[in-house]
């Protein structure tokens, strides 16, 4: 069984960061080692919250503890999400390097959270670190549309421009770019677009877009987690992309149908493992 170290925020109530990522990856057959960068009562969109961030040095100490018992060499991948400060981002880099030193076959997937995540906004300097440092280290990245524009340093309005931006990013280091949410001026307003790009291929997929009164938090964290889990279990990029598209849709639909604000992860757990509705991805020649 594969093991992933997941470095993200955490909420006690609800689903965001590791609280949205850990269970779906486990449901897909992956052992998850959660390292919480932030511990909050709930995500901040509620308007009231309690909690705090973990010290960056403590992050490294915790991973050193795993290494001390001889377990770090069994880590097959690192997934990072919200990193709240430049010291936390630097700690994540050192952790990835430690994992790869122990297991040269381990890979790193970076969800480059640069904007507001569950009401939390990273400190100044994190965005610059993500843009300048992370692409050279990451084996894969999963920006949303806004984050892709920041990484590429350009405005993106079409699928062709997005593919071009992803390929430019790939030339800096990553092998795979998963665009969790792509705005395309040519797409219907009721469709949600995702894009997966490698050096030689690109796939686009669409799922229904639901009109929530308040959009649930954690969908991006869920998306990255499912994609990483599918890749870890051996799925091809396209198969992982299609499974992610279908599984995330199932969770979002279950949440919408239940009229809930928090993601219905437990209710939709069978759909995460075996989605009943598939949308398929098609190759884009953009």
Swiss-Prot record:
Subunit and interaction comment: Homodimer.
Binding site for ATP: 111, 147, 180
Cofactor(s) recorded in Swiss-Prot or TrEMBL: Mg(2+)
Top-level enzyme category: transferase
EC number: 2.7.1.35
The protein, known as: Pyridoxal kinase PdxY
Chemical reaction(s) catalysed: pyridoxal + ATP = pyridoxal 5'-phosphate + ADP + H(+)
Database matches in CDD domains: pyridoxal_pyridoxamine_kinase (cd01173)
């Amino acid at each position: 069984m594969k093991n992933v170290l997941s470095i993200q925020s955490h909420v006690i109530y609800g689903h965001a960061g590791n609280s949205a990522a850990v269970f779906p990856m486990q449901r897909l057959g992956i052992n998850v080692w959660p390292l919480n960068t932030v511990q909050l009562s709930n995500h901040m969109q509620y308007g009231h919250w309690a909690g705090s961030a973990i010290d960056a040095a403590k992050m490294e100490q915790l991973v050193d503890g795993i290494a001390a018992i001889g377990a770090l060499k069994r880590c097959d991948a690192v997934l990072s999400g919200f990193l709240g400060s430049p010291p936390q981002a630097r700690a994540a880099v050192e952790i990835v390097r430690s994992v790869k030193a122990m297991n040269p076959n381990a890979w790193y997937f970076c969800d480059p959270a640069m904007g507001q995540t569950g009401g939390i906004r990273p400190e100044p300097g994190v965005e610059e670190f993500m843009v300048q440092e992370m692409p050279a280290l990451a084996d894969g990245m999963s920006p949303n549309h806004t984050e892709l524009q920041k990484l590429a340093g350009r405005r993106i309005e079409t699928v062709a421009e997005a593919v071009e931006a992803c390929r430019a990013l790939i030339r800096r280091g990553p092998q795979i770019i998963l665009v969790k949410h792509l705005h395309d001026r040519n797409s219907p307003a009721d469709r949600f677009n995702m894009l997966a790009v490698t050096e030689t291929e690109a796939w686009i997929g669409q799922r229904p877009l639901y009109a929530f009164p308040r959009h649930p938090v954690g969908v991006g964290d869920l998306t990255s987690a499912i994609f990483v889990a599918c890749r870890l279990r051996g799925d091809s990029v396209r198969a992982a992309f299609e499974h992610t598209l279908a599984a995330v849709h199932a969770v979002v639909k279950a949440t919408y149908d239940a009229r809930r604000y928090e993601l219905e992860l437990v209710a939709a757990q069978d759909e995460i493992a075996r989605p009943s509705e598939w949308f398929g991805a098609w190759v884009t020649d953009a």
